[in-house]
UniProtKB/Swiss-Prot annotation:
Protein localization: Fimbrium; Membrane
Cellular component annotations (GO), alphabetically ordered: membrane; pilus
Annotated transmembrane regions: 7-27
Full protein name: Probable minor fimbrial protein
Assembly notes: The pili are polar flexible filaments of about 5.4 nanometers diameter and 2.5 micrometers average length; they consist of only a single polypeptide chain arranged in a helical configuration of five subunits per turn in the assembled pilus.
Pfam families in the record: N_methyl (PF07963), Pilin (PF00114)
Annotated positions of the N-methylphenylalanine modification: F7
Cysteines engaged in disulfide bonds, as pairs: C56-C71, C140-C153
UniProt similarity note: Belongs to the N-Me-Phe pilin family.
Origin: domain of life: Bacteria
NCBIfam families to which the protein is assigned, alphabetical: IV_pilin_GFxxxE (TIGR02532)
């Protein structure tokens, strides 16, 4: 009697099925990771402007611009945000956008970042907002799915 070597077809099919399940799970987790990293990136990019806005408000320069008694928070361009520069003297690179804010700035200024088509498809058109309160504190809210938001940012369906 000959001794059998190797695996049976059934055993190989089971291994291939297990690898397929693991690969599909890993792909879904990676896609969620990409979305979460983009949301966190925009949270930080928009959040950087809070200090500049506070400086403008403290100096009493609330109109956006480069002139005397004007303020430029210096919003830098991002390839996953939509929105034109609000300072007419500043030109941003093509296919980039900047965080939007009211002109003039107010005590309850909202820094609004809208995700463009370069962001993950599940967050196209979603907004992330840093909202200033009269007390000077800031809070973050967004209409992106809650599972993608960092712990410091709350889901808000009304946006």
């Amino acid at each position: 009697m000959k001794k059998m070597h190797g695996f049976t077809l059934i055993e190989l099919m089971i291994v291939v099925a297990i690898i397929g399940v693991l690969a599909s799970t890993a792909l879904m987790q990676y896609q969620n990771f990409v979305v979460r990293s983009q949301v966190t990136r925009v949270l930080m990019e928009a959040g950087e402007l809070r200090l500049a806005v506070e400086q403008c408000l403290n100096d009493g320069t609330t109109k956006i611009g480069n002139g005397q008694n004007e303020c430029d928070p210096r919003a830098s361009g991002s390839n996953i945000i939509s929105g034109a520069s609000q300072n007419p003297e500043i030109v941003i690179a093509a296919n980039t956008g900047v965080v939007q804010f009211p002109n003039p700035l107010t005590e309850e200024t909202a820094l609004t970042a809208t995700f463009n088509n370069s962001a993950a498809s599940i967050i196209h058109g979603k907004k992330l907002i840093w909202q200033r309160q009269k007390s000077g504190s800031w809070y973050c809210h967004s209409n992106a799915a809650e599972k993608f938001l960092p712990s410091g940012c709350k889901y808000d369906a009304s946006l």
